[in-house]
C-alpha cells in the first residue's frame, strides 16, 4: 500500500484564517506570496477562512531584482516584504503583514509562530536557525493561530531545485485507512539534508539582471513556486497528500515527485 499523509485537521476547518510566515521575498518568495494570495481567495470561495500571511525580508529592491523577481522600477530602494505585501493588500483587499527583518529574531518570542512556515532563502544558516527555533515548540499539541504545524522549504541552483514540506510536530494525528498507510510525520528539510557537510558559498548581491541570471535562471523560481503551492493547495482542498515534495530539473525538463 502507498503511504499517505492526511492534513492536520485544524487547517481544514479553522475558526479564523490559517497563519503563514513566508521567510524571504526574493526570486522564489515573491512568486510564492502572489500564489498564496490567489490560494487564499480560492479557499474563501470554498467556505474556508483563507490565509493570513506575514512576510519577512530585510532586503531592499535593487536594479538586478527587476525582471527575475516580481518588482518594478517604482519599487527601487524599498523593502521587498513591504513592497510585495502593500501590492497584495491593495489588489486583493487583504490585511497581510510585512516585517522588514529576518525571522526568527530577538523581537519574536517562541509563541510568535504560524501554522505554516515557508522558507524561500538562499543560505543554509537561516534554515538551521529556524529549525533550532522550531524544535523548541514541536512537541506542543495545541491548535490555534500560532501553532506551527508544517514547514515548506524551497531551494534551487541555476536550473535545478526542490521543494519539501515536512511536519514541525513530531506527529500529526492521522485517521485509519484501509487503502493507504497513514504517515503522522514527514521530515523537514533539515532532517533530510546534513548541512554540516555542505560548505556554503557567499556569492554576494548581483549588480545586474544579466549577472543574476548566471546564478538563477529566469523561470526556476516561478516553476518551483507554482509546484510547491499546488502541493499546499491540494493539502487544503483534498485534505491529504501522497507526496511531500518534488525535484525539478529545467535542463532536462524532468520533475521527480518525493513520496510521503
Where are these regions (language model features)?
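Active-site catalytic pocket residues across diverse enzymes, especially alpha/beta-hydrolases
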Residues: 36-44, 70, 134-138
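Extended hydrophobic secondary-structure segments that form protein cores and membrane-embedded regions
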Residues: 20-23, 51-60, 100, 116-119, ...
